[in-house]
A protein has these predicted regions:
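Short, strongly hydrophobic alpha-helical membrane anchors
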Residues: 1-17, 237-241
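Membrane-interface loop-to-helix entry segments
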Residues: 18, 91-101, 139-142, 214-218
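Hydrophobic core of alpha-helical transmembrane segments in multi-pass integral membrane proteins
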Residues: 22-35, 124-132, 144-154, 223-230
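Small-residue-rich helix-interface/hinge motifs
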Residues: 36-90
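Membrane-helix interface "capping/anchor" motifs
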Residues: 39-40, 113-117, 133-144, 158-163
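Divalent metal-coordination and catalytic microenvironments
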Residues: 51-53, 97, 204
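Structural signature of hydrophobic alpha-helical transmembrane segments
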Residues: 108-125
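C-terminal membrane-associated helical module and adjoining short loops/tails
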Residues: 142-241
């Protein structure tokens, strides 16, 4: 019981804000990781986990039956769910993928701004554990376990300074990383009809009658607004207008 109490106090307590230079350095590092193809290729799988996890979470919340998630080496993925073939539940499930990394980043930024750094890391572990239970292929299981393992090691064993750097880097990465897949979606749709037919935006267009281009624009708007809001929350003290 004493161990549980100590753990709860650690998770629910507040931590001091890191120095401004660390916030700026982690923002620049995250932007470089997202912008560089060589680093994006492995790191982008974290965005795929968030993307497919978004489909899965909303499918369950909307009353659909989740059958599983598969993650692939090329950073693509697919989420299987069953339920009504029409209606808001299916639309929300399809729309959740591209916006989820950005929304998670904005939510995590709010926790960091409230000095709940440890809570943010442990909440990430809970979400990764839930995602792992839905994974249905070996590569997906390895990807989620590797991500969760890194979060656990840092949150449990690393000193506060390292935890802060890791947490801020992760949040900036979600915020910046939520934009790149939308840009890739827009570029891919303009180049390939096969991509267009298979994309979330085009599936949403078939469900709703709203043009796929407008769905892509909506995904982009959410990502940009989340980045703007998250950056405002994370900005070092004295930088706010």
């Amino acid at each position: 019981m004493h161990v549980i109490t100590r753990l709860w106090d650690r998770v629910s307590g507040s931590q001091p804000l890191p120095p401004g230079w660390l916030i700026v350095v982690t923002a620049v590092a995250a932007l470089l990781i997202v912008a560089n193809t060589g680093t994006w290729r492995p790191a982008g799988k974290v965005i795929t986990i968030a993307h497919e996890g978004g489909h899965a979470l909303v499918s369950v919340l909307s009353g659909r039956r989740l059958d599983g998630i598969r993650l692939h080496r090329d950073s693509s993925g697919v989420t299987y769910s069953r339920g009504k073939r029409t209606g808001p539940g299916l639309v929300l499930t399809a729309a959740a993928g591209y916006v989820m990394p950005s929304l998670l980043g904005a939510g995590a930024a709010l926790l960091l701004a409230q000095r709940h750094l440890t809570a943010m890391l442990w909440l990430a572990l809970v979400l990764l554990a839930a995602t792992f239970l839905a994974i249905r292929n070996v590569f997906g299981a390895v990807a989620v376990l590797a991500t969760a393992g890194a979060v656990f090691v840092v949150s449990y064993y690393a000193p506060p300074e390292v935890q802060a750097g890791f947490a801020y880097l992760a949040v900036w990465f979600l915020l910046f990383g939520g934009i790149r897949p939308v840009l890739e979606l827009a570029r891919g749709r303009s180049r390939s009809r096969n991509w267009a037919r298979a994309s979330d935006a085009d599936q949403l267009a078939q469900m709703t009658g709203v043009p796929a281009g407008l769905w892509v624009a909506l995904f982009g708007l959410v990502a940009v607004l989340a980045l703007a809001g998250g950056a405002t929350l994370l900005a070092p003290a004295g930088w706010h207008a």
